Regions:
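Regulatory sensory and allosteric helical modules in signal-transduction proteins
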Residues: 48-105
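Flexible loop/coil segments at beta-strand boundaries within sensory signal-transduction domains
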Residues: 118-124
């Protein structure tokens, strides 16, 4: 049983994956969203919703990937200060966060796009990430396309997932 919000978010991440020809799209929500979302849809937080949305479909609770409380990663803190970041290789990620880079390397990721999401009150909501795996570098579109599509989907997810008015 999935919620309407979850279904809509999955549609958005499917669309993003298709339009960027990437391998993985993740939505990582911050701890503070638990107080809004946890009440009526626990799965959001417990399973780092949607954990990994790949070409094979949505896999929930892919524990090895990004279900560690994500704001423990230094890169998440770094990203929340920047609107959009493009990492064409794992070297730049290693400089910021070796642990996160190791996870990506284990999954054979070669490139990563990240975009911060905020609530309507300007609070940190989470991070939208897209990544490409080894052998798929020819699928990576122009940087302007990545940025445009990620901005489009992030802004829709921000509206969809913003629970800051439900205090």
């Amino acid at each position: 049983q999935t919620s309407k919000i979850e279904d809509e978010a999955n549609e958005l991440t499917d669309y993003l994956r298709d339009s960027l020809h990437c391998d993985v799209v993740t939505v990582e929500l911050m701890h503070n969203t638990e107080k809004y979302i946890g009440g009526y849809h626990k799965r959001f937080y417990d399973e780092s919703f949607p954990s990994v949305n790949t070409a094979e479909g949505v896999q929930f609770n892919c524990k090895d990937y990004q279900c560690i409380p994500t704001n423990l990663f230094p890169i998440i803190g770094y990203m929340l200060k920047n609107k959009f970041e493009w990492f064409p290789s794992m070297k730049e990620i290693t400089k910021i966060d070796a642990g996160y880079a190791k996870i990506l390397k284990d999954y054979k990721c070669i490139a990563l796009g990240m975009r911060a999401m905020k609530t309507s009150k300007g609070e940190d909501l989470g991070i939208l990430t897209v990544s490409w795996r080894e052998g798929h570098s020819d699928r990576i579109p122009e940087l302007s396309v990545i940025q445009e599509k990620m901005t489009e989907i992030a802004s829709k997810l921000e509206v969809l997932l913003d629970m800051s008015d439900y205090d």
